[in-house]
Amino acid sequence: MSFEIRATITSDNPYIYETYRFFEELKIPYTLAFAYPSDNTSNQTLTTYSNESIERVRCSMAKLLLDYKDTLKKGEKIYNNVLTSQFSLFEYRMIRERICSGGVNYYTVLADGSIFKCAHLMNNKADIIGNIYDDNFHFGANLAIAPNINELEEKCQRCWAKHICSGGCPAQKLSLSRKAEQSLPEANCGIEKILSEFYLKVYTLFKQTRQCGN
């Protein structure tokens, strides 16, 4: 059975690089995400990104890039699932129709049968889209949480990272009182660009080491 570990990095975390290294050394597939505002408003400082915290992300990714360079040269496995999924997109020049399949072929179901488009929305009863015990509910309905990439606003359409971040997480936008078609706030968008550049650089290293026979 396939599985992965998921964890969230808060904006005040001074050990971003070390967090990635910890999960790589576990040698278990994992996904890390940067925290964003939610219904828990008591810790908003953990989801607010300053210029300093954004620069910390940039420096951590630069340091991690050197580690992955060594990993690839040695022919060792990378356990970062976000990276490996991006590799597939780059390798086959695939363009995602939307960033997330929530409400299309992915749903969250609670013990009482309540259905949500996304696990991030399950704290709000207003986001219940049906119940598995309701015979009238049809999964084939157009319930996608994420818009088609061509429906994103003009700022996203002109961005070089459009086909990598695909506009960003729609649940994150909803938590920020934005529409799914809108762009993320500047700080969050900046982090997405740092990560997109990082994915491209690691993929370039991956291709170079393969061509060298490693």
What are these regions (language model features)?
Residues 120-214:
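Flexible mid-to-C-terminal extensions adjoining Fe-S/redox cofactors in radical SAM and related proteins
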Residues 99-100, 108, 149, 158:
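Generic structural signal for beta-strand residues in well-ordered domains
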